[in-house]
């Protein structure tokens, strides 16, 4: 659109929000507000017209409503969508990225999220569990037979269900990881 500081918020966004907020002709808004000023300056008018304001604050999570994308996973296709979104939004813009590492990360995320979705209790289906699993994936260069807690989880799941979606993804990940050791 235009450069930062050129008046988009003041002359375009805020007038449109205030003009469109009407009880007679209600519309919904999704607004990116990096400075937090738009909500402060337009919230009163929106609330007066019956709007419910929800805020996702990625800087201060204590001031944020919570959103758990795991709650929207219903099948393997949804797992793949979440992984693709996660990868796209955490990519380093200045780096082309090595396709091998990106594919390995995608396989690992797919396996772990698949495990969480199909095997974890509902209250553990979240990014906290994913991070805990990632943090417990210790590798010992001097001991090729060492198995970390995540390896053991997948071994146990494979014993029960050898063709489980998460197991298949984890085996592909381990195969790729083994190709570089």
Please place each PLM-identified region on the residue numbering.
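Switch/coupling segment of Walker-type NTPase motor domains
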Residues: 1-113
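Non-catalytic, charge-rich alpha-helical accessory subdomains
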Residues: 106, 110-181
């Amino acid at each position: 659109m235009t450069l930062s500081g050129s008046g988009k918020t003041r002359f375009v966004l805020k007038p449109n929000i205030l003009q469109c907020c009407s009880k007679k002709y209600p519309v919904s808004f999704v607004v990116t507000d990096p400075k937090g000023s738009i909500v402060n300056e337009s919230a009163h008018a929106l609330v007066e017209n019956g709007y419910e304001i929800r805020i996702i604050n990625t800087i201060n999570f204590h001031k944020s409503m919570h959103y758990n994308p795991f709650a929207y996973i219903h099948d393997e296709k949804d797992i793949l969508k979440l992984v693709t979104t996660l990868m796209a939004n955490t990519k380093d813009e200045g780096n082309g990225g090595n396709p091998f590492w990106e594919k390995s990360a995608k396989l690992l995320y797919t396996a772990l999220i698949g495990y969480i979705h199909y095997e974890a209790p509902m209250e553990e289906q979240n990014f906290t569990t994913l991070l805990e699993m990632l943090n417990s994936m210790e590798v010992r260069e001097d001991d090729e037979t060492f198995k970390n807690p995540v390896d053991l989880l997948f071994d146990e799941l494979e014993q029960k269900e050898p063709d489980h979606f998460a197991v298949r993804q984890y085996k592909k990940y381990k195969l790729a990881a083994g190709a570089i050791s």
